[in-house]
UniProtKB/Swiss-Prot annotation:
Localization per Swiss-Prot or TrEMBL: Cytoplasm; Cytoplasm, Cell cortex; Nucleus; Cell projection, Lamellipodium
Pfam families: LIM (PF00412)
Protein name per UniProt: LIM domain-containing protein E
Source organism: Dictyostelium discoideum (Social amoeba)
Alphabetical list of CDD domains matching this protein: LIM_Mical_like (cd09358)
MF (Gene Ontology): actin filament binding; metal ion binding
């Protein structure tokens, strides 16, 4: 006959047909229970912890505790810090500073580049270029010397035929646009009036 196997819970003989084998122990089917809630377990639902049986709900959680005087913690704190060799005195790039500023090549090239000349701006002047003058006539009713120079300068500016022609063309175009705007405004008012009459 075979040697009798003892139950892991009650220490009585557990026959093979009446027992459950779990965690290298044999248990009676009635003894195979959770040690916390005494619910009956099966091979699929049991959990074993420190030689005791538990259901999945009551299985104790393993948590590590930090002990400040443990050898592993002391070794970790006293371990040498990782230092890359030679980084303290390392230079990146060349030993000289970069030339950024007015002496750089890009700046020098930009300053020495030929300037663009915009067509038609050579003779354009806004205003008279000096202080504003007031028309003060002398006792004889004639303009003073400074006022005569100003009048002569103004006459010279309007003697330029191209600018005068361009000014007249722009003035004519403006008048045409103004007339078109007025016609559109009148048409809009007529349509609005017609709409109100229909209502």
């Amino acid at each position: 006959m075979s040697a009798s196997v003892k139950c892991g819970a009650c220490a009585k003989t557990a026959y093979p047909l009446e027992s459950v084998v779990a965690n290298n122990n044999s248990y009676h089917k009635g003894c195979f229970k959770c040690s916390t809630c005494n619910s009956t377990l099966n091979v699929k639902t049991f959990k074993s912890f420190e030689g005791k049986l538990y259901c999945p709900v009551h299985t104790p959680k393993v948590s590590a505790t930090a002990v400040t005087d443990s050898v592993a913690l002391k070794n970790a704190l006293n371990a040498p810090k990782k230092v890359a060799e030679g980084l303290g005195n390392a230079h990146r790039g060349l030993d000289e500073k970069p030339n950024i500023g007015l002496d750089s090549m890009a700046t020098a090239n930009a300053l020495n580049a030929p300037k663009k000349v915009v067509e038609g701006l050579g003779n354009v002047q806004k205003g008279i270029g000096g202080k504003p003058t007031y028309a003060v006539f002398g006792a004889d009713g004639q303009p003073t010397g400074e006022q005569q120079e100003q009048q002569q300068y103004t006459e010279e500016q309007y003697e330029q035929p191209q600018e005068e022609q361009q000014y007249q063309e722009e003035q004519q175009q403006y008048q045409e646009e103004e007339q078109q705007y007025q016609e559109e405004e009148q048409q809009y008012q007529e349509e609005e009036q017609q709409y109100e009459e229909e209502q």
